[in-house]
Each structure stands twice: as C-alpha cells, then as structure tokens.
Regions:
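C-terminal tail/sorting-segment detector
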Residues: 10, 59-88
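A glycine-anchored, Pro-Gly-centered beta-turn/N-cap motif
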Residues: 40-44, 59-62
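Short, hydrophobic beta-strand segments
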Residues: 48-54
C-alpha cells in the first residue's frame, strides 16, 4: 500500500462514538491526529497528505495509524491498527 502524495484512510464505526485516529512513525512518536471527536455510525474516511501536525512534509517510511472508537451508548471500545508506507 505505498502512497504518494496522499492517501485516503477508510473506516467503519458500528455505533455513535468518540473517535480518535492518530498517526505514528515507526519509532512510536505521534506524527499527527487526523480525527478527534464524535462520529455517527457507518462508513467514514479521512485524507492524509503526508504532513505532520505542523504541516511539514514527512520523509519516506513506514507509518502506523491507530483508530479508537468508544461508544457513547454502550461504552464499548473498538480499535483498528494499520501500517502504511509513504514514498516520496
């Protein structure tokens, strides 16, 4: 799944939830928060343009995103972790 210059991250939310989608480098350092807020159930997507939280273009490498969705109603926690390869 190498990408350049941007990629779309698609996800499914089973219940109305508080959602965070955070991107980390291979060393585990937070690069950027892509989503942080309430989301309705269903399909969603977010575009990552290869930049960090300061808007600077990142170097080629492996990046990991972790999505956490905590249901507002049932308090269930849903998580998903994926790996992406960014090529300049």
């Amino acid at each position: 799944n190498p990408f350049n210059p941007k990629t779309t991250i698609r996800y499914e939310i089973p219940e109305y939830s508080v959602v965070t989608l955070k991107l980390y480098n291979i060393n585990g350092h937070l690069v950027k928060t892509l989503i942080d807020g309430d989301q309705n159930p269903g399909s969603g997507s977010v575009v990552w343009d290869g930049t960090n939280k300061s808007g600077l273009r990142l170097s080629s490498g492996i990046y990991i995103f972790i999505m956490r969705a905590k249901s507002i109603y049932s308090n269930k926690l849903f998580t998903s972790t994926k790996k992406m390869i960014f090529l300049k």
